[in-house]
Amino acid sequence: VIGLDLSPHMLVVAQEKAKQAGLAVQFVHGNAMETGFPEASFDVVTASLLFHETPPDVARTILLEAFRLLTSGGQVVILDGNQRTLRGTEWLNNIFEEPYIQEYAQGSVDAWLGAAGFAAVKTEDFWWIHQISRGLKPLSTQRVAQNENKTSLEEIFAEAGNPQVVFQ
């Protein structure tokens, strides 16, 4: 598991939380738009409360990088503010005082995921203030052919090794 953040302070906070929880996490200072990690090196990429703090074009660039980082069949999972709730409650946008929250609220994480190449895109409400969005990097035709004779998901995942997660 690798945690990535642009903020050195948040990396220190995350390291302390991981230590207290007894988790072995490698934390890296870096930019989610250009991580420097090799292509297809992660099975899962997550982003938590990131996109409402970025301009939409930056969010789209980050999603393109997530797509690049994922193996075929890999999944991106995004937890962020509920866009539908934010669109319907202007007062809530004013409370957060985030410079890009209005643009985020008017956008669509689903559309951004689709434009980045993700399939099976789905967003679900998580309570009334958050949403969880998911997308899958489509399987390559070669990987589909390799998996045709497998009888269970366990067989497919056994070959994947140890999945890694990037927290942005």
Identify the function of each model-found stretch:
Residues 33-45:
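A short acidic, Gly/Pro-enriched loop at the edge of an enzyme's catalytic core
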Residues 1-34, 61:
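Class I SAM-dependent methyltransferase SAM/SAH-binding core
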Residues 3, 43, 78:
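Conserved SAM-binding loop
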Residues 23, 40, 116:
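Structured loop/turn residues at beta-strand edges in well-structured enzyme cores
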Residues 60, 75-134:
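C-terminal alpha-helical "lid/dimerization" subdomain adjacent to the S-adenosyl-L-methionine
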Residues 60-72:
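A short glycine-rich, Lys/Arg-flanked "PGG" loop and its adjoining helix->strand segment in the class I
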Residues 43-57:
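A short SAM/SAH-binding and catalytic strip from SAM-dependent methyltransferases
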Residues 116-168:
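Core SAM-dependent methyltransferase catalytic element
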